[in-house]
Amino acid sequence: MVKLRLQRTGTKHDPHYRIVAADGRAPRDGKFVDIVGHYHPAQIKEQTTFHKEKILTWLKNGARPTETVLNLFKSAGIWAEYKTALKK
C-alpha cells in the first residue's frame, strides 16, 4: 500500500521534511515513488509547500496519508478539497 508520509532531511537540529509517496513497507528515509511537498517546522513560521495536483492524484489512486501528513493536509485545505471531489 502506498502511503503519503514525511521523510526527514536536513541537519541534526534543523529538521526539514519531504512529503513523499512511498511503499508502506519501505524505511522512513528509504526509497520513495514521488515527492509531493515539503515541510519546514523549525522556521519561525512553519513553511509548507504542496503539489496539490499530485497529492489529489495519489489520494484518488488509494494512497493513505499518515496522521501527521493528514493534519498538514487539513490545515492547508487539501483534505476538504479531496472529500468534496469524492462526493461528486
From Swiss-Prot:
Pfam family, one: Ribosomal_S16
Superkingdom: Bacteria
Listed GO biological process terms: translation
Nuclease found in the keyword field: no
Entry keyword set: Ribonucleoprotein, Ribosomal protein
Bilayer-crossing regions: none
One MF term in the entry's GO annotations: structural constituent of ribosome
One GO location term (cellular component): cytoplasm
Family listed: Belongs to the bacterial ribosomal protein bS16 family.
Protein name: Small ribosomal subunit protein bS16
Annotated organism of origin: Leptospira borgpetersenii serovar Hardjo-bovis (strain JB197)
